[in-house]
Swiss-Prot record:
It comes from Coxiella burnetii (strain RSA 493 / Nine Mile phase I). This is Lipoyl synthase. Coiled coil: none annotated. It catalyses: [[Fe-S] cluster scaffold protein carrying a second [4Fe-4S](2+) cluster] + N(6)-octanoyl-L-lysyl-[protein] + 2 oxidized [2Fe-2S]-[ferredoxin] + 2 S-adenosyl-L-methionine + 4 H(+) = [[Fe-S] cluster scaffold protein] + N(6)-[(R)-dihydrolipoyl]-L-lysyl-[protein] + 4 Fe(3+) + 2 hydrogen sulfide + 2 5'-deoxyadenosine + 2 L-methionine + 2 reduced [2Fe-2S]-[ferredoxin]. Its EC number is 2.8.1.8.
Length: 315
């Protein structure tokens, strides 16, 4: 019997063996429909970007979360940087990022990130992270340091953050983040509250809504953003309810995308939402008052985030 070592990164079956609602391994997954087409690329830019990231000791959520758009985005020289390591303190059953006891923060990471952004000549960058429940501020100060370093090295750049929930430390985290504010504040609601215990153990639906609204009230000039994965078992009514909840909590921008099971040990895909339904939900979101909406099978919260920020249609 293998002894559990919390300092090592656990994935898949090992990671999900300790969540409160057990998930049976999928033996006959749903067949992917024709509209789920992963964009492959043999572009040398992909390998060059991976080399650059490794040289600067950086991690991307694109790689760690097995994003279906990785080759497309890397081929265009864009990436969503994941700071504070590659070991998350949570065990979300939809997510492919590894779980474990995180390593100490790298004090060189802000500078390495800023230099990499400069080399890539980015004008819009997305910064996200693992959950760091081991830190008193959830890593918010490190976020601010990264944002400030990126801006100092890259004048005129726009910075979007996709943050964890800072559960139990919201005010402290926002106090720290105030020292280096982003241009867009994103926190994903992910799914309907009924599915939280299974999909997001350790998270809390009302808390996530409160984080988004509290940030907006403290910094009203900064757009707030959130996203949902569809196909986890939610109903159409639940999706519409979540969208209304987000608007009631002053969220400005919304992304809707199809959930894709990373491994057979993760939550299974309950259904593949049709492009037509994504279009209908996107139109409803606009009617509800979201200023920017990206809704489509392969949409992810940071997919073409620069175009999303400009209000262009992304699907």
């Amino acid at each position: 019997m293998t002894t559990y070592d919390p300092s090592q990164k656990s994935l898949g079956k090992e990671k999900l063996s300790r969540i409160p609602v057990k998930i049976e391994a999928t033996h006959t997954p749903l067949r992917k429909p024709d509209w789920i087409r992963i964009r492959l690329s043999t572009d040398s830019k992909v390998s060059q970007l991976k080399k650059l990231l490794r040289e600067n000791h950086l991690v991307t959520v694109c790689e760690e979360a097995s994003c279906p758009n990785l080759n497309e985005c890397f081929g265009h020289g864009t990436a969503t940087f994941m700071i504070m390591g590659d070991k998350c303190t949570r065990r979300c059953s939809f997510c492919d990022v590894g779980h474990g006891r995180p390593d100490p923060l790298d004090p060189e990471e802000p500078v390495n990130l800023a230099n990499t952004v400069s080399i890539m000549s980015l004008r819009y960058v997305v910064i996200t992270s693992v959950d760091r429940d081991d830190l008193r501020d959830g890593g918010a100060q490190h976020y601010a340091q990264c944002i400030n370093a990126v801006r100092e090295k890259n004048p005129g750049i726009k910075v979007e953050v996709l943050v964890p929930d800072f559960r139990g430390r919201m005010e402290k985290a926002l106090d720290q983040l105030a020292q280096g504010l982003p241009d867009v504040f994103n926190h994903n609601i992910e799914t309907a509250p009924r599915l939280y215990k299974q999909a997001r153990p350790g998270a809390d639906y009302p808390w996530s809504l409160a984080l988004l609204q509290t940030f907006k009230k403290r910094f009203p000039g900064i757009p707030t953003k959130s996203g949902m994965m569809l196909g986890l078992g939610e109903t159409r009514e639940e999706v519409e309810m979540v969208m209304r909840d987000l608007r009631q909590h002053e969220v400005d921008r919304l992304t809707l995308g199809q959930y894709l099971q990373p491994t057979r040990y993760h939550m299974p895909v309950d259904r593949y939402v049709t492009p037509q339904e994504f279009q209908e939900l996107g139109e409803l979101a606009k009617k509800l008052g979201f200023s920017n909406v990206a809704s489509g099978p392969l949409v992810r919260s940071s997919y073409h985030a620069d175009l999303q920020a400009q209000g262009e249609r992304v699907s």
